[in-house]
């Protein structure tokens, strides 16, 4: 993918990454609200490539005071534009001050770059990673930026705890709901059930929604924005006592990002499952339950020299995977061997307050 930038009538710059032909491309929402293609990276991966400066006129002298490239990780809060926070800032000098009389190429490399957070484009905040090339000139510096997308990978044990809770209105409604776990990866399926223990109000329908809440700032400068990113009707009609309603919600079809906690001490992203019942008088009864969403690695990283590594050596592991499991045991060499083989809440009518 060629990224071009015009220097008036003098020159143009092109940033080419080393592995463009094989690196995965994903879509991400830009400032214009449209989806754009970007190269995908993970935590710990090196970012390497070449900067091309091409002169538009042959034998034309192009003066500069130096050329550099930066790798930047940045958080920008929209209500405080112009006050971005760079949590990563790496610089490589490509050329000293001088003149260019012909097209020039400058290789660059940022080895094993730490990328602790996931790329995020929110309602009031954005987190981005990008390369910036700067050609320093006497009057105005010339710059070009190339955005990269970073995915933060995680791995959780399969024996996640389920969520069970009984809620109700005294002598009117008493239900028990259950979700199979409280942590879901972005391609997961939410499975659960609703069991009606007591029904003395006329229920018209019931739905489950996924609410995304973005919290930016702290104290009096806190901005909280919530939106419904998914909604699914799970029952139409009046239930009876003893009836059980199954829940099955596929997450893969929705535009979701992982849950985030106090990223750069600037913002958090939380998700809630919102169970809503509506009666025949259009009164709404609801109960929210927070869940964690995480991005699953396609391939689990293996330790070099282990049996699992031998089984997986024909596949490529994705770097930057954060695992939450116990480390694998290592077999120590035997002394006699010359060689060793390493190896409860209530529901109420909706009056602008959560019943939880």
UniProtKB/Swiss-Prot annotation:
It comes from Caenorhabditis elegans. PANTHER family: VACUOLAR PROTEIN SORTING 26 RELATED. May play a role in vesicular protein sorting, similar to the yeast retromer proteins. Keywords: Protein transport, Transport. Pfam families: Vps26. GO terms for cellular component: cytosol; endosome; retromer complex. This is Vacuolar protein sorting-associated protein 26. Belongs to the VPS26 family. One of its GO terms (biological process) is intracellular protein transport. InterPro entries: Arrestin-like_C, Vps26-related. Residues 301-356 are annotated as: Disordered. Residues 315-324 have a biased composition (Polar residues). The gene is vps-26. Residues 331-342 have a biased composition (Basic and acidic residues).
